[in-house]
Amino acid sequence: MKMKNVSRLLAMFLLLNAVCLIAFAQKPAKWTAPDKYKTMKNPNAADVSTGKDLFAKHCKSCHGKDGLGDGPKAATLGVSCGDFTSKEFQSQTDGEIFYKMTTGRDKMPAFGKTITEDNDRWAIVSYLRKLK
């Protein structure tokens, strides 16, 4: 009788482990912006200086001073912070970047709540374009 209980317990443990491995091994869903943002144009494209200052204040701790995703907080998050110099990132429209910065997701804060002026978030988008 004891051996039967041990076998059941072991089987349940192995099943639970398999479920956890599958759940954590999956890549996060692709982060897409709604269509209306994909065509948005940056009304503040020339304001790179303000964007640089705001990036240093709000983004650098995770994304690093050069936008490589290697800021001091990045290692503690358990997820990639992304590389703003990458072709993949730079291929997004300004509106897509603006949307993601504004709404956030998972460990990425929703900066629409802390950087409340749209023009300031657009200025950060302008600065991010210079990181190519």
Locations of the language-model features?
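C-terminal segment of classical bacterial N-terminal signal peptides
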Residues: 16-24
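Gly/Gly-Pro-rich "capping" loops immediately C-terminal to redox-active cysteine motifs
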Residues: 41, 48, 52, 64, ...
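Conserved functional loop/turn residues at catalytic and ligand-binding sites
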Residues: 58, 63-66, 88, 104-105, ...
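The canonical Cys-X-X-Cys-His
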Residues: 51, 55-65, 124-128
